């Protein structure tokens, strides 16, 4: 047994060394050079340079030394990191199609999820085009979003009611936002209240989804050394497989109950699930597609919107003059109106600017989702991006590029009010790309740009907000921590004070 294990170890080391020296030869081969970067060490590459600290900060610091287009070896995996507006514009305008595939973390290969998920399927795959079209024309259309608006308004009302019940008390802002938005997403998609519903199924679904969100952020040796992927040495794929199976079982039960509801000719719910099941009945998608779409809504939608709101509230508490200005706009526009409606947010340009500025400074997806170079021929900044490499857009660094922004590290919402033409969330102006850009723009954007400003307006219109325990704005810690997303290093606690 010991001899066989020793041979396995030597075999793995031999393969690793082969890949390492092959990479060095390629770096100095003919044609366009690879982007500059720190010299990789045998086996580990540059992993020693990015361990500890905040990952996107580390990448920015390395880019200051090696340039805005940089090669980074993480184990045996070649990464090209793009950290400036100019380089990002070149990549998206010239090579969006070439870079529109995804680098797939091994965890998401569990249950074959990545092979059927719109998040990870290459954009050249007909299946991706079909799923993207379904989202654009059947899930996030103005008609469908308008039909579900009463649900969103009711669930935001529930969130405000929760905060009213805890007025004058210290609350964890991120937890309150996540709970409220998870309820809203679950009810909008399939009319199930995940948090308050007393069923074991609802509680278990939330717990399992939370577990999956945590595990996907763990460093995985299978991603750094792809030849070890079949061994799943850390067991993360096996662990995730069990959770995926449980999630899909629970969601499958929800689908079956809805199908029975339809067969019995009971009234429609007019939620997203009704729309999706109509497509399944027409043969445009299958059950696995439906399960994946529902799962993606939970993992990506609820968590991202909740973290965004936590960040904007942190910056408002850090900058009380900005909060006062945003609340003054609410009074001017809404007057004595007690309850904010979703449509009101469009009439609040300064509040929209506050939100955009918080997302510029603290994008939840600081590195977006990794892209993957499917073919040779991509050149950015005069350097070759090799086929098979992972391409990381450091959106956090790009949106703090001094070539694009004055005082890039300061919280100045006025920059979005004064700018002409106005910057939107769609990433056409690459210096502001919190939802990505190009073909892989976040498909949930139409929902997020309605929900997040609506919740923010409701929170500021109903409550004054204070820091707990006599903490001053200067003492509030708004430093960042990178997990699966860019989060506050110290979760935000605040006190909602009901406006009389």
Swiss-Prot record:
Q: What is its main location?
A: membrane
**Cofactors required:** heme
User: What catalytic activity does the UniProt entry give for this protein?
Assistant: ent-cassa-12,15-diene + reduced [NADPH--hemoprotein reductase] + O2 = ent-11beta-hydroxycassa-12,15-diene + oxidized [NADPH--hemoprotein reductase] + H2O + H(+); ent-sandaracopimaradien-3beta-ol + reduced [NADPH--hemoprotein reductase] + O2 = oryzalexin D + oxidized [NADPH--hemoprotein reductase] + H2O + H(+)
**What is the membrane topology listed in the Swiss-Prot or TrEMBL record?**
Single-pass membrane protein
List GO BP terms, alphabetically: defense response; diterpene phytoalexin biosynthetic process; diterpenoid biosynthetic process
Q: Where along the chain is heme bound?
A: 442
InterPro entries, alphabetized: Cyt_P450, Cyt_P450_CS, Cyt_P450_E_grp-I, Cyt_P450_sf
Q: Note the PROSITE patterns from the entry.
A: CYTOCHROME_P450
Localized where? Membrane
One Pfam family assigned to this protein is p450
Q: What is its induction?
A: Up-regulated by methyl jasmonate.
E.C. numbers: 1.14.14.112, 1.14.14.123
Give the top-level enzyme category: oxidoreductase
A single Gene Ontology MF term assigned here is: oxidoreductase activity, acting on paired donors, with incorporation or reduction of molecular oxygen, NAD(P)H as one donor, and incorporation of one atom of oxygen
**Transmembrane segment boundaries:** 4-24
Which superkingdom is the protein from? Eukaryota
Q: Which UniProt keywords apply?
A: Heme, Iron, Membrane, Metal-binding, Monooxygenase, Oxidoreductase, Plant defense, Transmembrane, Transmembrane helix
One GO CC term of this entry?
Answer: membrane
- Provide the family line: Belongs to the cytochrome P450 family.
Q: Name the job this protein performs.
A: Enzyme of the diterpenoid metabolism involved in the biosynthesis of both phytocassane and the oryzalexin class of phytoalexins. Can hydroxylate syn-pimaradiene, ent-pimaradiene, ent-sandaracopimaradiene, ent-isokaurene, ent-kaurene, and ent-cassadiene, but no activity with syn-stemodene, syn-stemarene, syn-labdatriene, C11-alpha-hydroxy-ent-cassadiene or syn-pimadien-19-oic acid as substrates. Hydroxylates 3-alpha-hydroxy-ent-sandaracopimaradiene at C-7-beta, resulting in a 3-alpha,7-beta-diol corresponding to oryzalexins D.
The protein's name in its UniProt record: Oryzalexin D synthase
